[in-house]
């Protein structure tokens, strides 16, 4: 270990920053956040630093660096663009046995400022010992994505109640269990939802109870269409906290690979030919069963759970059975697939509205407004439509939509195997058959679909042509 990590208490202690530019200003802001007594020395200051000096938040020393600026200083930061000045600061600090940092110059520094993830009172510092600062920044970005901004509030809440937690849970095992509940349960969820008063009340109520109720909870998570990079930070956190994951058939293996390794994974996806209502009833029962067993359950759905995902039905069931829940939205297939195909869903020249439509209706009724769907200057995004392509095109054309209207079929959208097949609405079913298009695939109908030919950037793009009659007969 080349450098020894330290966390310094700078509250009220003098720190000198030599330099008056933008880099110096960034260092000053960090030091002020740590409540340091900051002095800034330079021939001239940026407007930001000058304002801080005028407000009395820093003390300005105007002119060229002098060693006596170091009087009573605990630390010094050199942030000028002149290496000779920086070296003079470093030498003067070393002579006085004061730790010094020269920005972006490890050779002249006796301490380094790490990349920081601030969730005060929790702080994470990352250093590459000056060897690879870009790598340290990359790691910081990854760590930032793992820790919600509510984590600081949660740590502060736990610290405030620590004496009472110790009093009410004197047994070490019970106390650890309570902290697990506090950090992973509904109190943390309320803080993530920016509801601190309710979180405080819930913690107070829990402390009054003789023991934890052991109740679990359900998080309804939208997994997006497949690319794990499209997961939200909240979705990633939920996957890492889950005890059990009930996932749909269309959730990609790459997304599941990001989940907590020891979480139970239960496939509950519906398959063609199954009784979907019976399958949904089984999912409802599993959600309640696992939650009542005290588990943290993630219900993982492709796309967004509230866009043709029956998420509303599941929440109604959970509410009726007294199970706590929260919802993490996902990027729905229409948005992601269109973007990955280079298709803008709206365009000032072609489409002023977008309609998301399911082609998988109840078997006993067709409730779609075909006349409304056939209007021009709008984009239609059909979900679950691969088995209904002939009907979709025929009804749109019958209700007035031109057979020359462009379409795009996006198969396995956002995944490495993505294909986009485009053509004319009149040829939709025939083109899909000739290219062997299979689910999962999203159908986009409208003038904007024609832009995929020029704007596509990901995966394969195939320009569909209606097969010749002989080919169709074969």
Swiss-Prot record:
Pfam family, one: TP_methylase
The keyword S-adenosyl-L-methionine appears for this protein: yes
Entry keyword Transcription: no
Active site (catalytic residues): 248 (proton acceptor), 270 (proton donor)
Superkingdom in the source lineage: Bacteria
Keyword annotations from UniProtKB, A to Z: Cobalamin biosynthesis, Lyase, Methyltransferase, Multifunctional enzyme, NAD, Oxidoreductase, Phosphoprotein, Porphyrin biosynthesis, S-adenosyl-L-methionine, Transferase
Gene3D superfamilies (UniProt xref): Cobalt-precorrin-4 Transmethylase, Domain 1, Methyltransferase, Cobalt-precorrin-4 Transmethylase, Domain 2, NAD(P)-binding Rossmann-like Domain, Sirohaem synthase, dimerisation domain, Siroheme synthase, domain 2
Signal peptide bounds: none
Example GO BP: siroheme biosynthetic process
GO molecular function list: NAD binding; precorrin-2 dehydrogenase activity; sirohydrochlorin ferrochelatase activity; uroporphyrin-III C-methyltransferase activity
Enzyme Commission number(s): 2.1.1.107, 1.3.1.76, 4.99.1.4
Annotated region (Precorrin-2 dehydrogenase /sirohydrochlorin ferrochelatase), positions in chain: 1-203
UniProt-listed InterPro entries: 4pyrrol_Mease, 4pyrrol_Methylase_sf, 4pyrrole_Mease_sub1, 4pyrrole_Mease_sub2, CobA/CysG_C, NAD(P)-bd_dom_sf, Siro_Cobalamin_biosynth, Sirohaem_synt_dimer_dom_sf
Chain residues that bind S-adenosyl-L-methionine: 225, 302-304, 307, 332-333, 384, 413
Binding site for NAD(+): 22-23, 43-44
Residues with the Phosphoserine modification: 128
Pathway where this protein functions: Cofactor biosynthesis; adenosylcobalamin biosynthesis; precorrin-2 from uroporphyrinogen III: step 1/1; Cofactor biosynthesis; adenosylcobalamin biosynthesis; sirohydrochlorin from precorrin-2: step 1/1; Porphyrin-containing compound metabolism; siroheme biosynthesis; precorrin-2 from uroporphyrinogen III: step 1/1; Porphyrin-containing compound metabolism; siroheme biosynthesis; siroheme from sirohydrochlorin: step 1/1
Reaction it catalyzes: uroporphyrinogen III + 2 S-adenosyl-L-methionine = precorrin-2 + 2 S-adenosyl-L-homocysteine + H(+); precorrin-2 + NAD(+) = sirohydrochlorin + NADH + 2 H(+); siroheme + 2 H(+) = sirohydrochlorin + Fe(2+)
Segments of this protein annotated with the region Uroporphyrinogen-III C-methyltransferase: 216-474
Family: In the N-terminal section; belongs to the precorrin-2 dehydrogenase / sirohydrochlorin ferrochelatase family.
PANTHER family: SIROHEME SYNTHASE (PTHR45790:SF1), SIROHEME SYNTHASE-RELATED (PTHR45790)
Record's function text: Then it catalyzes the NAD-dependent ring dehydrogenation of precorrin-2 to yield sirohydrochlorin. Finally, it catalyzes the ferrochelation of sirohydrochlorin to yield siroheme.
Protein name (Swiss-Prot/TrEMBL): Siroheme synthase
Native species: Bordetella petrii (strain ATCC BAA-461 / DSM 12804 / CCUG 43448)
Lineage: Bacteria, Pseudomonadati, Pseudomonadota, Betaproteobacteria, Burkholderiales
